[in-house]
């Protein structure tokens, strides 16, 4: 069952293109890890999926009755509310015992402390508790393990494994990612690549994809050398077929330049 679709979405900040005409379907049972080098737009994509930011083009379509719960990198709160009030805002009153339990698991035992005096890490943990106290069908988590100690990470790992809904998250914790996901989506060079596996399996499949891309580029370079030799022999565009061959050569040369530029950028990112 499909619960949410990202349809032909594009987003640009200034001159930087984050993604171009990308699509993604989130299906029943998916626990997705969204990965990519810093600056590729992972957090922006989560915001668009959560509905807190608009794409330049395209749309996000939710299934009927599908509710989302979003953990942002920077929590928003009212200055005059305490931790428990913040976590329970908009929730059912009978969820309060569970809210207190989750806060305790996340190391926040003073539930009456004002949000505006908490440290950045405590605020993020309070926001995580707010996201989990009444889990929606789809959890959207941006760096959920930041500011968690090892016991808290293990608790969250078990929580997500037991969670019956769907998940898409960004995290730099590769061990956590490997343990809780069953699908990896990579944001790379403004495009999305989906792998039906956890992080360890993704590394193997990505290596295979990159080897295929290198083989394709090597084949293109070989053809390019042959065409260049043909042109240097003094070909004149005396016929439509010859002109078409020259045009194809120019197209291949431009494609080769673009492929090389992408490869050089990958080396810089590494």
Where are the language model's segments positioned?
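ABC ATP-binding cassette signature C-motif
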Residues: 1-217
């Amino acid at each position: 069952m499909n619960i949410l679709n990202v349809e032909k979405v594009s987003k640009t900040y200034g001159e930087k293109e984050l993604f171009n005409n990308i699509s993604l379907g989130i299906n029943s049972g998916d626990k997705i890890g969204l990965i990519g080098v810093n600056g590729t737009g992972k957090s922006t994509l989560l915001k668009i999926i959560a509905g807190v930011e608009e794409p330049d083009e395209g749309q996000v379509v939710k299934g009927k009755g599908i509710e989302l719960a979003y953990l942002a990198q920077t929590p928003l709160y009212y200055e005059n509310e305490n931790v428990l009030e913040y976590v329970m805002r908009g929730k059912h009153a009978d969820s309060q015992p569970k809210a207190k339990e989750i806060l305790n698991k996340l190391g926040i035992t003073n539930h009456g402390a004002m949000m505006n005096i908490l440290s950045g890490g405590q605020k993020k943990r309070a926001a995580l508790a707010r996201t989990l106290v009444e889990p929606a069908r789809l959890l959207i988590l941006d760096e959920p393990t930041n500011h968690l100690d090892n016991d808290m990470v293990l608790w969250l790992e078990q929580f997500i494994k037991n969670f019956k809904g769907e998940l898409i998250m960004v995290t730099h914790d590769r061990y956590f990612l490997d343990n809780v996901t069953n699908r990896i989506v990579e944001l790379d060079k403004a495009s999305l690549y989906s792998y039906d596996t956890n992080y360890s399996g993704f590394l193997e499949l990505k290596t295979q994809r990159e080897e295929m891309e290198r083989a394709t580029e090597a084949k293109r370079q070989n053809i390019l050398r042959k065409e260049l030799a043909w042109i240097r022999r003094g070909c004149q565009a005396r016929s439509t077929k010859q002109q078409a061959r020259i045009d194809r050569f120019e197209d291949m040369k431009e494609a080769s330049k673009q492929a090389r530029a992408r490869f050089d950028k990958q080396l810089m990112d590494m």
